[in-house]
Amino acid sequence: MVVEMNRLLFAIFIWIGCTLVRAEIGIISPAEANRLIESSDASVKPIVLDTRGGYKDYFRGHLPTAHHLNFDTLRGTQNGIPVEYLPDDITKALLIRAGVNRDRTHLIYATGDKLPNDEILSASMVAYVLEKYGVNDIRIVDGGLMKWQQEKLPVTQEYFGNPKGALPKFDSKQIGIDIDELLKRKNDPNVLLVDARPYNEYIGQDDIWLRKGHIPGAISFHWARLMAKDNTHEFLPFEQVKMVVKDAGLTPEREIIVYCGTSREGSLLRFYLKHVAKFPNVRLYEGSWKEYVTLKQHPAETLENKVR
């Protein structure tokens, strides 16, 4: 009886341990992220990635053990189009150099503040790239550095470099699509094309883009509607925005393709729908509007579309 009880307790202990460190993609509270960082168990210590573009921001202070991975190092000009995702071999080399590891949890963050601050998009873009290359244990720190500091958690100016990483053998490139697949899929009645940019860009009232408007058939859903007004790095609970999302026509039964200007805003909308709302089929058109505007054989429109 005692032996059987000991076996049961041991099994429960193992189950709890596995549950605490199980692989998943989603968000994590600052307190829980700090608990992982401070863990004495090397097997659960996370890879922490500070994705801010400004290196001086990293110098001013960052999460303990954070390795600075400027999000824009993962993009460059290709065929004359700026900020395209880099080729596979270069991207993989950069991720390995940053310590990305198939066997570890990855904590990703930027700063966070009111709009126009949009540094959460740096974090969601890096999370997208990691997921694309097969990493399945990724958490964005909810609220970013702003909330971390509000909760009086430790910040340091010490530098940290991760040891060489190791990527999974199999990638998940199906989470993104290229222009050819977009053109094939976008007119399917079960497909919903969603533009994650601000509404003024969607209807062409901006001074940014070579051509004005959006991809024909796309609806508008600005990514910031899913985030807290006083901190764009803080995710609103899905229950709080469920009706807003549904009323816009975004439902889990649809195949959803998101895009934006350069893919950062789209990466956030995809992350929320896929990993917070748990929609099963959400993909990102990686080229986004910056690529589409160069393809002048394909039309653009400025009239607003609604889901019927």
Describe each region flagged by the PLM.
Residues 33, 66, 130, 148, ...:
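Terminal peptide-recognition signature
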